[in-house]
Amino acid sequence: MTIGLSGGIDSAVTAALFVDILGPDNVLLVNMPSCYNSPMTQTIAEQTAQSLGANYTVIPITESCLHTSEQLTQTPIHSYHQHRDFQLTISPLIYENIQSRDRGSRVVAGLAAAFGGAFSCNSNKTELTVGYATFYGDICGALAPIGDLWKHHVYELGRYLNDKVFQRQVLPEAIFTIRPSAELSSEQTVGTGGDPLVYP
């Protein structure tokens, strides 16, 4: 099983579940930082992978996302109806979705194929219910083990995994206290912004 490991609670709980079920040798965790990802979440991701004993790699996405954006905005589109060429523009929201899709549809899906297995969807029920997700991005994957859990249940499951299942701190304490954030823009930092949702 291949899992995108961001340094947040959702992907960490998903990773711990699959390591418990499949064993660490059958789990590949990948951190995919962009220029918006904090050193803190990148460190938490690596600490989590190390504690779980799983396979781990880091594949940055900034260059590929910028390349995609340039292709989309600089390639002329011809209107045969209006007999003219035009070009598209990319809003900040579209660029956020490009990052999510690059992670899910390119990196994680490609790694899963090469690793010889499936990949997971790390979305929780809170995000799915309000539509805080990206098609072909963070909501793609063969299985969604926390898809029917509200965000506060994900935190509770994380504590349970530490205390009862692994009986040690496999999920770092910082993962329970850091501000939840997709880290897709400068407004979504774990220090000041975070997700646009208020989780109970």
Where are the model-predicted features located?
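ATP/NTP-dependent adenylation/nucleotidyl-transfer catalytic domains that generate, transfer
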Residues: 1-200
